[in-house]
Amino acid sequence: MAVPSAHEFHWQSLARLSSGRVYHSLAEVGGQLYMLGGCDAAGRPTSSLELYSPEVDQWVSLPPMPTARAGAAVAVLGKQLLVVGGVGKNQHPLKVVEVYNTEEGKWRKRCSLREELMGVAITVKDGRAFAVGGMGADLLPRSILQQYDLRKDVWALLPPMPTPRYDTSICLQGSKIYVAGGRQCKRSVKAFEVFDMDSRTWSSLPSLPCKRSYSGVLWDSTGRLCWLGGLRLGGIHQSSKFTKNVNIFDPSQGSWMRSEDTVSMKTKRADFAAAIIRGRMVVAGGLGHQPSVLDTVEAFHPEKRKWESLAPMATPRCSASTIVIRDRLLVVGGVNQIPSSAHEILYVKEEEIL
């Protein structure tokens, strides 16, 4: 299937949130979009759970979470939403775990984590959730790898990561969990490691080419890791700089592609929305060297080997929560000086939206 051209991508504004929101979590169950928690305009974690109904283009309030939280890790286990960690009302990490049954419309508290954690990454394999890393109440990163069994309601410890970290990017490929980058005490790390579920062992991979934060991290259809843009933190005598670099790791080769074989983005940016839509890497919004939040959008054309500008976002913002449902990118909330209530979708014109 040919990739869509730049002019075929269109934005549409959808029903706004009831109030500005940031650091909320999104999940899809049966094609339905759920939004959980996040911080309000005053920076307070919320307990709200909302469902977006595309048929009538509106948000519907559902029973709130028992525990208010922001930045939670959410995993979909069948028809249930598993909510793990995050930051609570006291601005401290949480250990409480809760599950929402989308068919029953009810919340249940489940077996807690062994300790309070925020910045946990999570993935699902064969009906079990795997929680990776996190930051504890002492503000130190963790190397913990935990497996949750919903039927038994129990967390099991697996061999820890070689490199402790939080806010990492993970991807499940077959029976392997790839863990790329992350942070330690607010500093970014270059560590890139993989956990083999069959042998229950960790292996180190070639490190990320440079330390940078707030990058876009994508895994394409061939299993390659694409590391886009971000903020390179300066040292004692250097200021931090936004970058437009693109780095690609090919698991089949076990190495990072040479910089001359990749194509940089048009605009330097960090903290932006990123997704792969119909075979094209897309980046939208974020922060750059400009004085205001970005509204620019660009997409990489793999055959032309260049980035092309798309129509801009209607609402410029950074720190938005995103999810791809049926090859449509939904960008929900975020920040433009204050938390935003904007909710927009990027889709290819030849298709019907949602």
Label each region the model flagged.
Residues 1-354:
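Kelch-like beta-propeller repeat domains
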